[in-house]
Amino acid sequence: MEKFSTHTGIGVPLRQSNVDTDQIIPAVYLKRITRTGFEDALFAAWRKDPAFILNQEPFNAGSVLVAGPDFGTGSSREHAVWALKDFGFKTVLSSRFADIFRGNSGKQGLLAAEVAQDDIELIWKVLENAPGTEVTVDLVSKTVMCGNVVAPFEIDDYTRWRLLEGLDDIGLTLQHEEDITAYEATRPAFKPKTLPARLS
């Protein structure tokens, strides 16, 4: 997972509240076994409408999604995060996230930044009045900047640390690789053990 400290990209104002994971990526796409290639599935039902914001330039090149409250509700789907990332989003701003979506995002390297709704409204106005305006999200200072709007955002310390260090679950485990190897070396031979992957 890549480290995340600061990102600047085109902001996409999504004036929708209660966006659930089935709207983010419909269930029909969950049959795939890979973790990539989901960009076409993102908001698939809504993108059938030519007027949908992600079908419009310059928003189709956006990397900062500015959504309404209660983003990512519904069932737990890592695919929702994968679809957002595959489309090109690095961060989602909302005044409230579903806990499961927030957790999945942090584990996959997508920043879910909780911004006060009043500030979201101000950012929406900037982005709608000047399409293509870039939004800077600074994880170090926990600040969002868009036009003349400067707003703080909330994120729990543990997820912030993981993003800054670029640590997914595997990365966290590998921090203890020496201890794991030492433990495995002392285990009786008759017990099961994990073998190294074979590259072919």
Curated annotation (Swiss-Prot):
<comment type="subunit">
    <text>Heterodimer of LeuC and LeuD.</text>
</comment>
<keyword id="KW-0028">Amino-acid biosynthesis</keyword>
<comment type="similarity">
    <text>Belongs to the LeuD family. LeuD type 1 subfamily.</text>
</comment>
<dbReference type="InterPro" id="IPR050075">
    <property type="entry name" value="LeuD"/>
</dbReference>
<dbReference type="InterPro" id="IPR033940">
    <property type="entry name" value="IPMI_Swivel"/>
</dbReference>
<comment type="function">
    <text>Catalyzes the isomerization between 2-isopropylmalate and 3-isopropylmalate, via the formation of 2-isopropylmaleate.</text>
</comment>
<dbReference type="GO" id="GO:0009098">
    <property type="term" value="P:L-leucine biosynthetic process"/>
</dbReference>
<dbReference type="InterPro" id="IPR000573">
    <property type="entry name" value="AconitaseA/IPMdHydase_ssu_swvl"/>
</dbReference>
<protein>
    <recommendedName>
        <fullName>3-isopropylmalate dehydratase small subunit</fullName>
        <ecNumber>4.2.1.33</ecNumber>
    </recommendedName>
</protein>
<dbReference type="GO" id="GO:0003861">
    <property type="term" value="F:3-isopropylmalate dehydratase activity"/>
</dbReference>
<dbReference type="GO" id="GO:0009316">
    <property type="term" value="C:3-isopropylmalate dehydratase complex"/>
</dbReference>
<dbReference type="Pfam" id="PF00694">
    <property type="entry name" value="Aconitase_C"/>
</dbReference>
<dbReference type="InterPro" id="IPR015928">
    <property type="entry name" value="Aconitase/3IPM_dehydase_swvl"/>
</dbReference>
<keyword id="KW-0100">Branched-chain amino acid biosynthesis</keyword>
<dbReference type="InterPro" id="IPR004431">
    <property type="entry name" value="3-IsopropMal_deHydase_ssu"/>
</dbReference>
<keyword id="KW-0432">Leucine biosynthesis</keyword>
<comment type="pathway">
    <text>Amino-acid biosynthesis; L-leucine biosynthesis; L-leucine from 3-methyl-2-oxobutanoate: step 2/4.</text>
</comment>
<keyword id="KW-0456">Lyase</keyword>
